[in-house]
């Protein structure tokens, strides 16, 4: 198993709310969550793994993430953990108002749930109606009479009484219908009422990540609770406020949404969309964090936004409740209830679509209040370096340093080169990608890296018509025409100008970037450098030669019947007898150029080919450094001649040489200051090896006996490094003024991180001028080629 292989581990989605009557179950999907089969599987798995977990001292199985940091469950002693079920029920008070109700250990919680399940399934009425011990009676204090705490005042005894009355009302039905009804009232073997109590935390634990693990099943979500004034979200204070808005004493601006929240304020106080997962133990942290970051948090914020603006969630809850009553009156049972709700409730349909898409690694396109929202866990099909041979990855993955362009945006998920290299952390994907529900848009990092995307092109991963149909776009819409205009040989900047002039579309660079980001996020396009016959391409080390080669040979032959076969075409690009050459060397004539470029795009799409990029470092030889040192010495000597020592200074030096009483002074503050200045002065370069004394009358220049020096960042060169560079330009290479201009454009790319191909795209430098400059300074650069 590997982080590069998608594994959502999603079992189902469960929606619960909290009203003045307490926690309530609204909808769950899929229907298989409520079945005797899953219940028996849960109990069997619990019996098989209980001893194993105790012997191996497994980490805490139940945790609740609060707003700041995760808290450890160390509150129970070893003696308390060894209590039997009966002792636990008699000595421990399980009050939903108490924080220990949510912070218990796995064994305590399962003992409680299993005992209640046995009691509920018991056939004897006397056993069901047996009085509870005084320790389990509800304890209600005056401190917890606030509206927020009233939502969680159901204790174990109250839940048991409700079950007893429910079982007594259904005692006249036959045994088959009773068992079916019991299956409908549980989720993975847990009673819905108990899960509602667990999954409706106090308000202090809402509006933040909530995670609890019960019997290897993870219940994770983002519970959303309304504020004291009934609003569901708050904004920071802005310059201009609308009429009717209220500013609190702490500087927060609350929206006056009395029209939409007056009803829900008195009824629904919290809603919680819970995702139920069963991830592998080794990948537990990573899979849960991945699901929460990409899907759960964003979907919860969207629902909060719609609830705040349009009271959407509460209206759907009332509709679902009414639909359940209508269905039971018409059918007499719950057969087909899920399908009935999905067909008539947009929220139920969104939950269903979300589960089916995410569990299949697809993109969930949800219509939330008639607005299209897309959610997904990005699949790792792009790598910036070659993974280890033992690290699994998806066939046809793309290998290129170009993927670093979107590494921090959250639009793509770069693959891991080592097994479990991220150690369960999403630190590389979480920054730079945030979903602001108040702004109702997906915001990406607007730094210089994402600005460079206009110099790149898009490679469509599917047929344009299929993409337009899949994203539900109108055929004549702006994005549809943009998709039809995409060519892998043209940059987005050129495409924007083309749309403005020829297609008569008012498309600016920002809109083109937005379209490109959406296509990348929807997995319909890939960012690449524009394909060119002058570039060098090789067979990718990650080419799917052992997976899809035979099928792709047929597909390549069907798409390009006039071209050589796929193996022969790949041999043209990476012949073992010669170095890689420009792609133009493989094209027979100009008439074949277009079809060969299309074939190159096809190979790039399926991961068979990658582009070789050229990276350059600027090298400073020892000869250059010695010449610069001589120039500095001559400059220092000239300064001495132009500024001779005055008689007073000469007399002072003689006095210091003959007067022994001043020896302590000469060895004291002045020399100490000189040494301190020299020590504290920042070096020009770690490899410069030159130190200059701050005393103008005693300049010491020291040249360390080292070899050549590579300047790591010429764009931010120090004064000494600039002298080295000028010595190369004007004395060693003697560049013409035109070449000097090209050199300074080229200088900031000599860091080994930015390729020369990017220089050609951004700085408007011709290949001829670049080749001429490279030939002139070839003795002072180090160049390498890789993907």
UniProtKB/Swiss-Prot annotation:
Entry GO CC: GATOR1 complex
A GO BP annotation: cellular response to amino acid starvation
Endpoints of the signal sequence: 1-21
Biased segments, Low complexity type: 157-179
Keyword Nucleus: no
Keyword hit for Signal: yes
The entry's keywords: Meiosis, Signal
Biased composition (Polar residues): 139-154
Domain of life of the organism encoding this protein: Eukaryota
Biased composition (Acidic residues): 69-85
Record region (Disordered): 25-89, 121-182, 233-262, 661-693
Disulfide bond sites: none
Function comment: Mediates inactivation of the TORC1 complex in response to amino acid starvation. Required for meiotic nuclear division.
Family statement drawn from the similarity comment of this UniProt entry: Belongs to the NPR3 family.
Protein name, as recorded: Nitrogen permease regulator 3
Gene that produces this protein: NPR3
């Amino acid at each position: 198993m590997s982080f590069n292989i998608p594994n959502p581990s999603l079992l189902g989605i469960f929606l619960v709310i909290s009203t003045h009557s307490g926690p309530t179950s609204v909808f769950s999907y899929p229907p298989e969550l409520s079945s005797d089969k899953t219940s028996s599987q849960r109990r069997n798995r619990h019996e098989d793994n209980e001893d194993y977990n105790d012997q191996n001292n497994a980490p805490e199985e139940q945790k609740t993430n609060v707003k700041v940091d995760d808290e450890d469950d160390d509150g129970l002693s070893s003696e308390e953990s060894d209590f039997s079920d009966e002792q636990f029920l008699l000595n421990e008070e399980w009050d939903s108002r108490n924080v220990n109700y949510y912070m218990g250990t796995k064994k305590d919680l399962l003992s409680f749930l299993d005992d209640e399940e046995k009691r509920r399934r018991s056939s004897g009425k006397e056993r069901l109606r047996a009085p509870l011990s005084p320790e389990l009676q509800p304890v209600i204090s005056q401190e917890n009479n606030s509206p927020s705490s009233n939502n969680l005042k159901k204790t174990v005894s109250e839940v048991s009484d409700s079950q007893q009355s429910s079982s007594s009302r259904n005692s006249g039905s036959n045994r088959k219908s009773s068992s079916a009804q019991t299956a409908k009232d549980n989720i993975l073997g847990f009673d819905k009422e108990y899960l509602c109590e667990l999954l409706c935390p106090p308000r202090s634990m809402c509006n933040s990540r909530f995670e609890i693990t019960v019997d290897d099943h993870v219940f994770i979500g983002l519970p959303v609770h309304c504020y004291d004034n009934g609003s569901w979200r708050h904004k920071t204070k802005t310059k201009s406020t609308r009429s009717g808005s209220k500013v609190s004493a702490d500087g927060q601006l609350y929206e006056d949404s009395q029209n939409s929240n007056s009803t829900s304020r008195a009824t629904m106080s919290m809603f919680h969309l819970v995702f139920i997962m069963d991830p592998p133990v080794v990948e537990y942290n990573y899979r849960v964090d991945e699901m929460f970051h990409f899907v759960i948090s964003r979907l919860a914020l969207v629902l909060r936004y719609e609830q705040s603006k349009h009271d959407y969630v509460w209206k759907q809850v009332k509709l679902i409740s009414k639909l359940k009553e209508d269905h039971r009156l018409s059918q007499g049972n719950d057969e087909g209830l899920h399908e009935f709700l999905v067909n008539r409730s947009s929220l139920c349909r969104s939950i269903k679509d979300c589960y089916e898409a995410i569990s299949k690694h697809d993109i969930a396109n949800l219509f939330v209040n008639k607005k299209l929202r897309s959610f997904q866990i990005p699949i790792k099909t792009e790598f910036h370096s070659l993974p280890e041979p033992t690290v699994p990855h998806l066939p046809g993955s793309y290998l290129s340093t170009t993927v670093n362009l979107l590494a921090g945006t959250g639009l793509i998920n770069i693959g891991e080169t080592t097994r479990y290299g991220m150690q369960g952390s999403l630190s590389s994907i979480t920054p730079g990608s945030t979903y602001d529900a108040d702004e109702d848009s997906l915001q990406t990092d607007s730094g210089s890296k994402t600005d460079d995307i206009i110099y790149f092109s898009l490679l469509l991963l599917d047929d344009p018509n299929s993409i337009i149909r899949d994203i539900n776009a109108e055929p004549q819409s702006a994005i549809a025409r943009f998709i039809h205009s995409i060519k892998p040989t043209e940059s987005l900047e050129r495409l924007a100008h083309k749309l403005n002039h020829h297609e008569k579309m008012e498309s600016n660079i920002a809109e083109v970037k937005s379209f490109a980001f959406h296509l990348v996020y929807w997995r319909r396009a890939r960012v690449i450098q524009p394909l060119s016959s002058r570039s060098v391409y090789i067979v990718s080390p990650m080419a799917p030669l052992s997976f899809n080669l035979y099928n792709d040979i047929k597909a390549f032959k069907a798409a390009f019947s006039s071209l050589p076969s796929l193996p022969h075409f790949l041999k043209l690009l990476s012949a073992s007898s010669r170095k890689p050459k420009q792609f133009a060397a493989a094209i027979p004539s100009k008439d074949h150029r277009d079809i060969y470029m299309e074939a190159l795009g096809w190979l790039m799409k399926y991961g068979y080919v990658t582009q070789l990029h050229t990276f350059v470092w600027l090298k400073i030889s020892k000869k250059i450094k010695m010449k610069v040192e001589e120039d500095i010495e001559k400059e220092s000597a000239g300064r001495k001649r132009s500024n001779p020592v005055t008689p007073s200074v000469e007399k002072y030096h003689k006095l210091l040489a003959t007067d022994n009483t001043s020896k302590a002074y000469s060895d004291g503050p002045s020399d100490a200051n000189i040494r301190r200045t020299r020590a504290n002065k920042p070096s020009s370069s770690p490899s410069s090896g030159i130190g200059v004394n701050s005393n103008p009358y005693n300049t010491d220049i020291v040249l360390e006996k080292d070899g050549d020096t590579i300047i790591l960042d010429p764009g931010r060169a120090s004064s000494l490094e600039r002298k080295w560079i000028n010595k190369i330009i004007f004395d060693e290479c003697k560049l013409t003024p035109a070449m000097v201009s090209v050199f300074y454009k080229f200088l900031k790319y000599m860091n080994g991180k930015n390729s020369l191909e990017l220089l050609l795209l951004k700085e408007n430098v011709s290949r001829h001028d670049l080749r001429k400059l490279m030939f002139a300074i070839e003795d002072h650069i180090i160049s390498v080629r890789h993907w």
